[in-house]
Amino acid sequence: MVKNIRYSIEVDSKFHIENFLGNNNNTNDSFFWTEDHDHGGRQFFFTSSLISDMNSATEIIYTASQIIAIFQGIYTLLDRNRNGSNYFTIRNVYDIDSKRYLEKVQSTEIYKIDVDFSVIVASDENKPTNPIYILFEEICKDPFLTNLFFLLSNKVDYKMLYIIYDDIRFYLRTINDKTFLNPYKALLNDFTHTANNYEVLGFYARHGRTGHQPPSAPINLENSKNLIFDIIGNLLISKFNITLPDYWGMIYMDFSSVDLVQLKDILKKV
């Protein structure tokens, strides 16, 4: 598996993705796994080669939080059903060499990515097959992508979406692409006018009162999210040759056409 792994980090997740991430976790850098608990049930763990040489619990948590933020960003983009949900919560750090838990450290809020992901080297020997780990390795190859998925790890609101929009425009300027966003021009105009306008969003607007007229057709948060996330998906395909996976370990059922009375009777018999 991973070379020189020293720490296992206990992680909580409320979204039943442990088995998906714990299986087929062959990789050369960062991964999750599950173990049976002594008192029943299963525990969820994470580790990374990027923390193996560290000794400070504070440094380990700080670095691991940034790495896990990338996975959080992946799930935020793929799973559009929950805004601002924490898919991963760090609990404890266990030193495998000394067989002891490190002192608990209060998790600090991460404002930006400053971990050097370039030290992660893809290995043919440990080439990932799980689509989440494949996507993670692709993200780690480019600083723009690591920052993008860090931004995605934050609560979905107008401010978060606008920062992502700004970052995408900045990236497009660096590659002198002036046309990529043209198909979205009308919707982006509605989005920016909505996000900036205090009369529409109040405290949640990007600006205070400016005297500008509110947009004639404000775009709600759900549609704003889908707009920016669709742009991200197309950007990944066209600029990085990255296709997002169709399945990521979470299953949803559409109950709109289900006879709920009949379903209730069936469940009683199970």
Question: What are these model-predicted stretches?
Answer:
Residues 129-270:
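Amphipathic, oligomerization/interface secondary-structure segments
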